[in-house]
Amino acid sequence: MTRKYFGTDGIRGTVGQSPITPDFALRLAHAVGRVLRRTQERPTVLIGKDTRISGYMLESALESGFNSAGVDVVLLGPLPTPGVAYLTRAQRASLGVVISASHNPYPDNGIKFFSAQGTKLPDAWEEEVEAALEQPPVWADSASLGKTRRLDDAAGRYIEFCKSTFANDLTLRGLKIVVDAAHGAAYHIAPKVFHELGAEVMAIGCAPDGLNINHQVGATHPDALVRAVRANHADYGIALDGDADRVQMVDAAGRLFNGDELLYVMVAARLARDEHVPGVVGTLMTNMAVEEALQRRGVKFMRAKVGDRYVLEELQRQHWLLGGEGSGHLLALDRHTTGDGLISALQVLQACVRSGKTLAQLLADVPLFPQVLLNVRLNPGQDWKTNPVLADAIRDAEAELGAHGRVLVRASGTEPLLRVMVEAREAEQANRCAQRMADAARAG
């Protein structure tokens, strides 16, 4: 069944345009509430959000929709996406709801859901919700309407959970760390986590005004972090995105490390302690150098579709624990049920502290292949798959690269973009092939 509203990470779009409107949010919550009440007499849902100004409007609409279906609501306020996932499980709630468009700019927003176990929900559940949306509302009678309360210590509970994933015998004392929260959901949480574990913390991107989320800061704009690390002679820099489910890191020299590299560090740290790591899941975008390095160490590697939900599904199928994406969505299922930027950063810092090595030293044997990613904006209704010029360009690039590189062309699941990725042993070759395909896509 083709889904009408749900994409790869919930429902997302521009505020004020369908489906990100208050009336749709109310109808959506009512439909979700009806689905929940098919199996539960009195469901409870948690609602968290990032710092976009539109979050207030959507939060109120969702609250009303759930209450009208006989569902109780607990408001968490601004909280990272993984914090909502954790509290949904810890509070024994029926469902977790996040109002966020992650790394997108403030005019966008979105709505996504977590199961009672704190995991992303399957496509089948989303299809059930979409079917319920097509039915007329059935309002609960007055005696059965839901109620709403606020969990005032939600942030503090999540901070303690994050700290609990860091080894008790280690400390961050003596380290200077720059933390960039992208003016997003972790603005009041991330600096405290690292400070309470002993680090000297300098915070940037921690002054949200409702309009500046992800603006020239955070994991998708790491230049600000690189400058701050160098200017303050810090040991590390940590950049989160707007909802803090992804992370990028910087070392004292200002070198940026992406999710592929951080995932390898997490795996290598476990191998160094003789922990069994049977396999790791990446995506179609994961750098070939990481795959080869893991295989040299006897660790199986599998590629899932792009999107942390698909990495999670493959991990569950294989009964493995570790996976992630180059974008910084990293999963360690014995630490958390979903990708968590803060916990991932703590796992990497733990590896550095325990080994006494820097990130560059831990990754000395894993030089990444040059990888070029170009985004081509698609016109409404444009079908890139039927573009013969692009098809020829893809075939030519694959023939030129052979076994020494990769080509991936795919539509974004969250934006009207065509993503063109080329990986090769030489940067010039990767750039040339990627540009040819991007030009062909624009010509179509």
Curated annotation (Swiss-Prot):
A GO MF term: phosphomannomutase activity
InterPro entries: A-D-PHexomutase_a/b/a-I (IPR005844), A-D-PHexomutase_a/b/a-I/II/III (IPR016055), A-D-PHexomutase_a/b/a-II (IPR005845), A-D-PHexomutase_a/b/a-III (IPR005846), A-D-PHexomutase_C (IPR005843), A-D-PHexomutase_C_sf (IPR036900), A-D-PHexomutase_CS (IPR016066), Alpha-D-phosphohexomutase_SF (IPR005841)
GO cellular component, one term: cytosol
PTM text: Activated by phosphorylation.
Annotated residues for binding of Mg(2+): S102, D241, D243, D245
UniProt GO BP: carbohydrate metabolic process; peptidoglycan biosynthetic process; UDP-N-acetylglucosamine biosynthetic process
Record field: catalytic activity: alpha-D-glucosamine 1-phosphate = D-glucosamine 6-phosphate
Cofactor: Mg(2+)
Domain of life: Bacteria
EC number: 5.4.2.10
Entry keyword set: Isomerase, Magnesium, Metal-binding, Phosphoprotein
Principal EC category: isomerase
Isomerase is among the record's keywords: yes
Cofactor note (record): Binds 1 Mg(2+) ion per subunit.
Phosphoserine, modified sites: S102
Catalytic residues, chain numbering: S102
HAMAP family (alphabetical): GlmM_B
Family per record: Belongs to the phosphohexose mutase family.
PANTHER family assigned to the protein according to its UniProt record, in alphabetical order: PHOSPHOGLUCOMUTASE (ALPHA-D-GLUCOSE-1,6-BISPHOSPHATE-DEPENDENT), PHOSPHOHEXOSE MUTASE
Known role: Catalyzes the conversion of glucosamine-6-phosphate to glucosamine-1-phosphate.
Annotated protein name in UniProt: Phosphoglucosamine mutase
Gene it is expressed from: glmM
